[in-house]
Amino acid sequence: MNRVNDPLIFIRDIKPGLKNLNVVFIVLEIGRVTKTKDGHEVRSCKVADKTGSITISVWDEIGGLIQPGDIIRLTRGYASMWKGCLTLYTGRGGELQKIGEFCMVYSEVPNFSEPNPDYRGQQNKGAQSEQKNNSMNSNMGTGTFGPVGNGVHTGPESREHQFSHAGRSNGRGLINPQLQGTASNQTVMTTISNGRDPRRAFKR
């Protein structure tokens, strides 16, 4: 069975324990290098597609080759929780293949790797809760992110990449405080916090 031809999965559909994942994403940030006890280098990279962002853990020399703006196809990856955060891994036999640069529609929000106490509750309640959550969030993906941000970039820090603002779209407590924050070391968050007033104006 050739898993390279398996269907792609969106970042929003990644859940802990899923294996043989095929995902296409754009690299947004490369984290600092950490070394394991046995000498391996590990990088945590923030990646995104049109449905949201997630952290991927990349080991050794491959991590040194990845650059922000690279569009990459992951084959045979898997997802797991690490320190309470959903993380994507290449896995055994997994591959990262660069298929382009820069030109990809993506959304940084929601960040599925942020610690989310609600997710632990959903995990314990089982599939019924997941289905209820999915039906409530069914217009989120491209439908909610596009119109809420309306394609309007606010502030001088706007990037050429299309990304939008989720606001309170998923009800997670940790995303809203970040949208209201104005930390100087988070230029993207500055852009998002400036987007709050125009959204109110569009609703009127």
From Swiss-Prot:
Residues in coiled coil: none
UniProt KW keywords: DNA damage, DNA repair, DNA-binding, Nucleus
Polar residues compositional bias, start-end: 121-142, 177-187
Organism superkingdom: Eukaryota
GO cellular component terms given for this protein: chromosome, telomeric region; cytosol; nucleoplasm; nucleus; site of double-strand break; SOSS complex
Region (Disordered) residue spans: 114-187
Pfam families: Ssb-like_OB (PF21473)
GO BP annotations listed: DNA damage response; DNA repair; double-strand break repair via homologous recombination; mitotic G2/M transition checkpoint; response to ionizing radiation
GO molecular function: DNA binding; RNA binding; single-stranded DNA binding
Subcellular location: Nucleus
Chain residues forming the annotated DNA-binding region: 26-99
Assembly with partners or alone: Component of the SOSS complex, composed of SOSS-B (SOSS-B1/NABP2 or SOSS-B2/NABP1), SOSS-A/INTS3 and SOSS-C/INIP. SOSS complexes containing SOSS-B1/NABP2 are more abundant than complexes containing SOSS-B2/NABP1.
Task performed by this protein: Component of the SOSS complex, a multiprotein complex that functions downstream of the MRN complex to promote DNA repair and G2/M checkpoint. In the SOSS complex, acts as a sensor of single-stranded DNA that binds to single-stranded DNA, in particular to polypyrimidines. The SOSS complex associates with DNA lesions and influences diverse endpoints in the cellular DNA damage response including cell-cycle checkpoint activation, recombinational repair and maintenance of genomic stability.
Family: Belongs to the SOSS-B family. SOSS-B2 subfamily.
PANTHER family: OB FOLD NUCLEIC ACID BINDING PROTEIN-RELATED, SOSS COMPLEX SUBUNIT B2
Record's protein name: SOSS complex subunit B2
Organism placement in taxonomy: Eukaryota, Metazoa, Chordata, Craniata, Vertebrata
